[in-house]
């Protein structure tokens, strides 16, 4: 079987590389399944404290591999919703629910589901040459992989409408100026910058970071009172964690903390 997903665990970081460079790492069914298997490992393995996603070759991910769908214009209409339900929706839900930081290093073009996958990660770093392309509309399709949810939240409604309906290229620099991504770095520095950040997160109190991630997600729909109550509950949970006790002990002893993520 072809290996469309490369994974490596080192120093608490799982690096996942989309590995179909001849197709700009476009998604196919086998890639989806291999990625799902890696994410299950990341969820279950307590030694994995941070996830880093990137692409092989000159692109990050060009979205769905249209050749994999074998759409025959003269045949019956395909059920594209089935692939969304079977692959993309579980992928988005898994990344959102993962109680660990997820970093995306966009090393080239990110189009369609590749763009929305990247922008849905917790922290997005992009090479200076990278581009984001919401290509759905050019095929007569609607955004998937969480695109219609994440775009208004990271770019604002007006820009989300323009990006999704026009389908124009968006440079990494412009995405950073609009606040859609965390940082743009020179192409040659992307890998090292992303890995340094991931290794930093892997040494941090990731139990609390997971609660921060969940609190921010729930803030999208909560009222102020609901969010204040949630902060109370999460602070109670964080205060009972091993990480909090270690952080305070290390501070008082003037030594570096050794967090466990628990």
Name each model feature, range by range.
Residues 216-222:
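Short, charged, surface-exposed hinge/linker loops at domain edges
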Residues 31-34, 87, 117, 190, ...:
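Hydrophobic alpha-helical membrane-association signature
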Residues 1-56, 93:
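Conserved CoA-thioester-binding segment of acyl-CoA-metabolizing enzymes
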Residues 49, 206-213, 257-262:
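C-terminal capping/lid region of NAD(P)-dependent oxidoreductase domains
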Residues 93-209, 236-241, 246-249, 253-255:
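Crotonase-fold acyl-CoA enzyme core
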Residues 1-2, 249-262:
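Terminal low-complexity tails and localization/encapsulation signals of metabolic enzymes
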Residues 55-94, 110, 223:
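Glycine- (often His-adjacent) and acidic-residue-rich active-site loop
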């Amino acid at each position: 079987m072809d290996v469309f997903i490369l994974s490596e665990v080192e120093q608490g970081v799982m690096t996942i590389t989309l590995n179909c460079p001849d197709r700009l790492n476009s998604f196919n069914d086998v890639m989806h399944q291999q990625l799902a298997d890696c994410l299950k490992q990341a969820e279950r393995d307590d030694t994995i404290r941070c996830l880093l996603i990137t692409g092989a070759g000159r692109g990050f991910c060009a979205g769905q591999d249209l050749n994999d769908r074998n759409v025959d214009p003269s045949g019956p209409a395909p059920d594209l919703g089935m692939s969304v339900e079977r692959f993309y929706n579980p992928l988005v839900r898994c990344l959102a629910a993962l109680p660990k930081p997820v970093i995306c290093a966009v090393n080239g073009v990110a189009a369609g589901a590749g763009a929305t996958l990247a922008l849905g990660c917790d922290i997005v770093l992009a090479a200076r040459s990278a581009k984001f392309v919401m290509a759905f509309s050019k095929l007569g399709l609607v955004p998937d992989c969480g695109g219609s949810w994440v775009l208004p939240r990271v770019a604002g409604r007006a820009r989300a409408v323009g990006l999704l309906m026009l389908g124009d290229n968006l440079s990494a620099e412009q995405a950073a100026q609009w606040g859609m991504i965390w940082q743009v770095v020179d192409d040659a520095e992307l890998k090292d910058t992303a890995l340094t950040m991931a290794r930093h997160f892997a040494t941090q109190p990731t139990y609390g970071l997971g609660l921060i991630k969940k609190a921010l997600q729930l803030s999208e729909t909560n009222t102020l009172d609901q969010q204040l109550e949630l902060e109370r509950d999460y602070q109670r949970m964080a205060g009972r964690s091993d990480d909090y006790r270690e952080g305070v002990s290390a501070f008082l002893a003037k030594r570096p903390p050794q967090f466990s993520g628990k």
